[in-house]
From Swiss-Prot:
One of its GO terms (biological process) is translation. Belongs to the universal ribosomal protein uS7 family. This is Small ribosomal subunit protein uS7. Transmembrane segments: none annotated. The keyword Nucleotide-binding does not apply. The keyword rRNA-binding applies. GO terms for cellular component: small ribosomal subunit.
Length: 156
């Protein structure tokens, strides 16, 4: 966190195929070692596979999956007088998207399908239908915040 001035926000250009900023950010999150064309291939392949399987607009399903995984509240550790409390705090909009993308990608990697395209397609379809590991992670996060609601007055 800079002390002198606020760092200007970098804006991501929309992706070439769907013209979606969210898809472009997802590609950047999916990318490893600078291999952007490979990350694009994986996401576009997953969205094409979703279109073949469900006969729905894949971008709508992608947005629905993201909406179902975005957390509203999370807990942050706060030390007060020798004790550490898990304090529930509201999640900023940018962080909601970042967490949702991270969770979808991580739980897609843990799936048992053969290729990453199939894993990502499966996780996105599950998330759009409110099931799957990434949705469970969001529910666990919300449950933790609900359980620690008593410490909400320690917010900063």
């Amino acid at each position: 966190m800079p002390r002198r001035r606020e760092v200007p926000k970098r804006y991501v250009l929309p992706d070439p195929k769907y013209n979606s900023k969210l898809a472009a950010k997802f590609i950047n999150n999916l990318m490893r070692r600078g291999k952007k064309s490979l990350a694009e291939h994986v996401l576009y392949g997953a969205l094409d596979l979703i279109e073949q399987r469900s006969k729905q607009d894949p971008l709508d399903l992608f947005h629905k999956a993201m909406e179902n995984v975005r957390p509203v509240v999370e807990v942050k550790s706060r030390r007060v007088g020798g004790a550490t409390y898990q304090v529930p705090v509201e999640v900023r909009h940018e962080r909601r998207d970042a967490l949702a993308m991270r969770w979808i990608i991580n739980y897609a990697k843990q799936r048992t399908e053969k290729t990453m395209i199939q894993r990502l397609a499966g996780e996105l379809q599950d998330a759009a239908q409110n099931r799957g590991g990434s949705v469970k992670k969001r529910e666990d996060t919300h449950r933790m915040a609900e359980a620690n609601k008593a410490f909400a007055h320690y917010r900063w």
